[in-house]
């Protein structure tokens, strides 16, 4: 089996043990983090280049396999404790590939609450059930059943005896792992998700699902989540439907061994009861749970993609930005920040009020633009955003220098403004003005600003509140950490919120880093990190490669080269004939050509490192302090507004993707209405 990263089934236990991918408690004891650099580098050396998302998926697969093995052994022990474990059962457990298959095997041995079958067994009817199941040609079930009539046991007549026997047979059919597997497969292939209105006269957003059917194997995630929500809110009744003929025939092939026997009809009736009363309701729950779980996983991946796109937007560096937090009644909050994000000025204007107020607001905006030499206006995309955009576009036409504007997502700005972190960062500002500061700063550096907000508060998808919140939180946190680690952080300027997303650092250590910085001045090397209280060797190993120190005398401290690779990096530069002066200045011109001339394989062998590590070192030395966000399309700055009436057939426009969903994307082209594109590869 291949689990996606070239790991064979035989390798899994060793890999899981070596990398602590599965045993989280052990990882915690070792001070390990999911994105630990040592972990990543070892996997990369074994399997080639892997991004953090692939590593995370690999980790999740291994965790599932470990939980599968754990449950397998638990069931084996439980059955053995009942002295019913056979070689056949043990082999079936070994061959089971899913938790559902394991539970099917365990079902007959699971302690049961009182059931119709258990009551019949208490009455002594199990021998009758065994006789009927044998289906011997000469067997007369009625005659045999007469022997079990006993009023003291509440078996008043033959019908009672046969019914009890059928209850026992039905439960046995339901407990048959092979039968359940067949029915499950049939339901997955032929089943249909059906939704009907609880009250067809009552209008709701779910009207399209009031009489709706779609095959289990085809239903899209967003439609499944929609009917689930409609059911939860009381508008829909949802079920799985399937024609009964094929499943009943499938059961009969297993249970009816002698169709000509009089007992066969009784077995057939018991099979029908087992399917209708016991098997299908259980399979229906399983299918809906599996579909929902799968839809949630896929949706969370889409949410993660949306969040990643928000976080990895290219920064607008070194520009003075005026942030506008739009509003109607309470006005539009204004904040001006310099190129470093420092607050220069604040105000409140009323661009959606009376004509006099609009004129006054325009004058105030132009005054702020002139006073602080504003380069760009950042407009939040919430309530009154369109009106504010029109106002700003009109106002900047009268500015004394070129000014551009951009609409940014204001999701989570209000959450940030009311947070303890905002109160600590901006104690002098009113809560409402803090959101304007956030809107300005998230244009300058979206990642640095958005990490201050809980990922779920950023708003990354339509059904995010229907997701398992713990799992969603873990997924989004992983995305944030991946983005921060990908970009890196300046050790001397990064906020505690940004530092806390660096692999290996917790909130206590982050606060200690800031405290050390304030007490001792700027860090002069990565090695100085080791002096920070509570930052141990494991944490240093994991975080050092993601932290930059521009002020260091060692040029490698300002690159994405990990300290454990410094020796290899220096040896590489020596092999490539760079002078001490060039190394000190960090100027490695013609590096790629020199590496090619020597041969990457030869260099890797000489340095005794893997090719992926060598490639990473070369990339980092070639592009000092490279920011992966700079390789993406620059933010779309506008100086004038476009109206939908201005659009003509065959026009080609650039736009900003505002939201990605599993059936398309919504794109802002600046005309007040998002375009929709479903043709996304």
What are these regions (language model features)?
Residues 70, 74-78, 429-433, 437-522, ...:
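Long, highly charged, low-complexity intrinsically disordered interaction regions
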Residues 20-30:
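Glycine-rich ATP-lid/hinge loop adjacent to the conserved G-boxes
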Residues 7-19:
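Short conserved segment of the HATPase_c
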Residues 36, 40:
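Short alpha-helical Gxxx[C/S/T] motif in the catalytic ATP-binding
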Residues 148, 158, 252-255, 267-271, ...:
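Low-complexity, acidic/Ser/Thr- and charged residue-rich accessory regions of DNA metabolism proteins
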Residues 2:
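Acidic ATP/Mg2+-coordinating residue in the GHKL
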Residues 54-57, 64, 68-323, 327-429, ...:
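Duplex nucleic acid-engaging cores and interfaces of nucleic-acid transaction enzymes
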């Amino acid at each position: 089996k291949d689990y996606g990263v070239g790991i064979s089934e035989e390798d899994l236990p060793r890999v899981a043990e070596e990398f602590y991918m599965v045993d989280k408690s052990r990882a915690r004891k070792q001070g390990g983090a999911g994105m630990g650099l040592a972990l990543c580098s070892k996997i990369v050396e074994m399997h080639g280049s892997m991004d953090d998302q692939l590593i995370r998926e690999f980790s999740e697969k291994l965790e599932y396999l470990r939980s599968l093995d754990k449950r397998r052994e638990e069931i084996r022990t439980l059955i053995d404790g009942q002295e019913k474990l056979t070689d056949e059962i043990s082999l079936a457990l070994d061959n089971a590939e899913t938790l559902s298959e394991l539970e099917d095997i365990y079902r007959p041995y699971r302690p049961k609450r009182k059931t119709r079958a258990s009551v019949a067994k208490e009455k002594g009817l199990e021998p009758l059930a065994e006789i009927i199941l044998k289906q011997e040609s000469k067997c007369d079930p009625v005659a045999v059943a007469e022997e079990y009539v006993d009023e003291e046991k509440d078996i008043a007549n033959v019908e009672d005896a046969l019914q009890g026997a059928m209850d026992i047979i039905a439960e046995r059919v339901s407990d048959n792992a092979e039968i359940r597997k067949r029915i499950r497969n049939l339901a997955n292939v032929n089943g249909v998700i059906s939704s009907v209105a609880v009250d067809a006269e009552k209008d709701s957003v779910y009207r399209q699902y009031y009489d709706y059917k779609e095959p289990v194997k085809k239903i899209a995630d967003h439609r499944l989540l929609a009917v689930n929500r409609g059911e939860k809110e009381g508008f829909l009744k949802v079920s799985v439907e399937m024609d009964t003929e094929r499943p009943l025939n499938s059961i009969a092939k297993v249970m009816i061994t002698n169709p000509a026997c009089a007992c066969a009809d009784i077995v057939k009736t018991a099979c029908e009861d087992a399917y209708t009363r016991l098997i299908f309701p259980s399979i229906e729950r399983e299918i809906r749970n599996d579909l929902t779980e799968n839809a949630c996983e896929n949706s969370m991946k889409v949410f993660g993609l949306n969040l990643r796109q928000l976080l990895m937007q290219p920064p607008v560096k070194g520009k003075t930005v005026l942030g506008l937090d739009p509003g109607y009644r309470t006005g539009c909050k204004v904040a001006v920040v310099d190129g470093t994000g420092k607050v220069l000025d604040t105000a409140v204007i009323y661009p959606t009020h009376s004509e006099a107020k609009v004129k006054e607001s325009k004058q105030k905006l132009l005054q702020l633009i002139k006073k602080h030499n504003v380069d760009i206006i950042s407009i939040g995309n919430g309530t009154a955003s369109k009106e504010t955009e029109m106002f700003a576009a009109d106002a900047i036409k009268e500015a004394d220098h070129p000014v551009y504007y951009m609409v940014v997502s204001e999701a989570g700005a209000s959450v940030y403004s009311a947070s303890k972190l905002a109160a600590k960062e901006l104690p002098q500002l009113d809560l409402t003005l803090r959101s304007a500061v956030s809107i300005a700063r998230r244009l300058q550096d979206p990642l640095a600003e958005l990490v201050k907000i809980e990922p779920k508060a950023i708003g990354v998808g339509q059904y995010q509140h229907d997701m398992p919140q713990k799992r969603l939180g873990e997924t989004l946190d992983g995305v944030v950490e991946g983005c921060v680690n990908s970009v890196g952080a300046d050790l001397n300027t990064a906020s505690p919120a940004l530092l806390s997303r660096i692999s290996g650092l917790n909130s206590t250590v982050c606060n200690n880093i800031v405290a050390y910085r304030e007490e001792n001045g700027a860090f002069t090397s990565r090695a100085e990190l080791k002096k920070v209280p509570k930052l141990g060797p494991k944490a240093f190993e994991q975080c050092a490669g993601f932290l930059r120190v521009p002020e260091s005398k060692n040029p490698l401290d300002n690159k994405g080269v990990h300290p454990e690779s410094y020796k290899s990096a220096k040896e590489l530069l020596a092999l490539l004939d760079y002078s001490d002066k060039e190394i000190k200045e960090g100027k490695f011109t013609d590096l790629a050509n020199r590496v090619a001339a020597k041969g990457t394989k030869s260099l890797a062998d000489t340095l005794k490192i893997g090719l992926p590590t060598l490639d990473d070192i070369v990339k980092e030395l070639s592009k000092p302090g490279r920011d992966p966000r700079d390789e993406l399309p620059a933010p779309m700055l506008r100086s004038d507004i476009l109206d939908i009436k201005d659009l003509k057939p065959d026009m080609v426009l650039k736009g900003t993707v505002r939201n990605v969903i599993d059936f398309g994307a919504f794109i802002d082209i600046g005309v007040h209405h998002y375009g929709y594109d479903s043709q996304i590869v």
